[in-house]
Amino acid sequence: MLTFNDNKAGMNGLDKEKITKVIEENTSASYSSFSKKQQSRIEEKVLEIKNRLQTATREERQKSEILMENLEMKLESSRDLSRDCVCIDMDAYFAAVEMRDNPALRTVPMAVGSSAMLSTSNYLARRFGVRAGMPGFISNKLCPSLTIVPGNYPKYTKVSRQFSQIFMEYDSDVGMMSLDEAFIDLTDYVASNTEKKTFKRHRFGGDCPCWLPRFDENENTLEDLKIEESICPKCEKSRKIYYDHVEFGTGREEAVREIRFRVEQLTGLTCSAGIASNFMLAKICSDLNKPNGQYVLENDKNAIMEFLKDLPIRKVGGIGRVCEAQLKAMDIQTVGDMNLKKNLYPLCFTPLSQESFLRTALGLPGRPSESDPRRKSISVERTFSPTSDFNILLEEHQEICRMLEEDVRKSGIVGGKTVTLKLKLSSFDVLTRSLTPSDVVKSLEDIQKFSLELLEKEKGKEIRLLGVRLSQLIFEEDEKKRSKTITEFWNEKKLQIQNLQGSENVDDDDVIMMDTRPCPICGTDVENRLDVMNCHVDECILKVQNDDGPELICVSVENKSTQKPERPSTKKRKLQEKRPKAKKMVTIDSFWKKSG
């Protein structure tokens, strides 16, 4: 049974049964078969959970209760109510960009994508049940007047970079979760921002529909409102620009209003926001007052628990159709239910799932990660009409590899250690095949070579989606920090020597003979070469013997001491530097680094 998911802004109050029926009637037999198999697996898991709860003994339930009580105490000790976390989510982003650039799309139901798949839809289309992730041909059945526009992802990326620069002014470590969503920690900004701010505002009106944001003709005229009239260079109709000023106060709510205002002024696009003590809650809140609104959840435990009490579990990020079915098997419908029935988790779920569900029930963020927070992989995939024609698959494969290599270059990534091929068959079953070559996969040729090797093993299969992924990534910044090779080390030393020789301001106390060791007989610094040192020692021994001096113990210089040579005094060093046979010189620090 296919079910329609209406847990998205702008889709409240829809007739789910009617929409589900239309989807089922227009779904291919292959996908229906796949969906039934998937549903069968879910039902097996649900039955397993119900049986486990029925057979759990009293002792098991008591043990489970104690376990969750201890875990709750541990998690509560980590609750942090001091942060001002914000989730900014652009409103119907891809669709909004297209409507901004084409005024004719603003008053009709429209979506971005193709007949195969939609990326997003505007709010008018959502009233018909049209949403992201839905095939375009089914969307046309739900909304015959739907206009589908091909995606222009370079344009969406460019606009995203524009408003992300605004976010960085408030939090230099802003987390861009996607092109249209950002996590901003306003804590430091709010603490330091103690004065009101005033910004100049512009809005557009007149016969010209080209420009956003629009001026509301019903708005009460403000005292400082100024109007500038001109002819639009796009449509050549009369255009009015209304100028005035907007003031923003202090505090996190005002800061978020300020951010949203600046984004709209810069791009003509609106965004919504959620404000809370952590990003998990902020993301939930960002969906509540869409479009073009914001929701604030007080930094108070009681307020948080009250907020979560009646919240449907599907509103929480990470809880999808499968997880929802498993929780409903325990009669859990809301996040409040998750808290009431937390003692059942150890009976049915793994320790990681137990902690994850309890964190959600308590309104706490996910487990902190000690691993590298940067992306773990980068991939490109495409959906197309099912085919087993290998020539067609090769064309798709080459284009996907080209796009992936381009994304790798733009993302500051050197390459990856593992190549993965993803295939979705005409039956909708998904296959993944991976390969880890001996060398890092960096170039387009490497990506094509290794992924093609995997693809050739799947010849004859009817495929509807093809993707290539690089994982175990190596970043450019890592390459810069890596240990230097011996060659690089000596090249750098040579450069230091050249720079030092060309300098006239070298302190005598800061230089010594380069690449020398003291003679074990006379203490003189001698070039650190075995033949030179042996020759010098022989000369010293002969000289001492000819001078009728005391008998000396010959020290073998072939077996180098593991200790650092005794450094001659500063006075002796200066004398040595004045000798005509003095060699090149480097700094003392560089010498000891090399000798140590």
Swiss-Prot record:
Domain UmuC as annotated: residue spans: 85-320
Region annotated Disordered, chain positions: 559-584
Positions of UBZ4-type zinc fingers: 516-545
Residues the entry annotates as binding Zn(2+): C519, C522, H536, C540
InterPro entries given in the database record: DNA/RNA_pol_sf (IPR043502), DNA_pol_Y-fam_lit_finger_sf (IPR036775), DNA_pol_Y-fam_little_finger (IPR017961), DNA_polymerase-Y (IPR050116), DNApol_IV (IPR022880), PolY_HhH_motif (IPR024728), Rad18_UBZ4 (IPR006642), Rev_trsase/Diguanyl_cyclase (IPR043128)
GO molecular function, a single term: damaged DNA binding
Biased composition (Basic residues): 570-584
PANTHER family: DNA POLYMERASE KAPPA, DNA REPAIR POLYMERASE UMUC / TRANSFERASE FAMILY MEMBER
Protein name, per record: DNA polymerase kappa
Organism the protein comes from: Caenorhabditis elegans
Taxonomic lineage from the root: Eukaryota, Metazoa, Ecdysozoa, Nematoda, Chromadorea
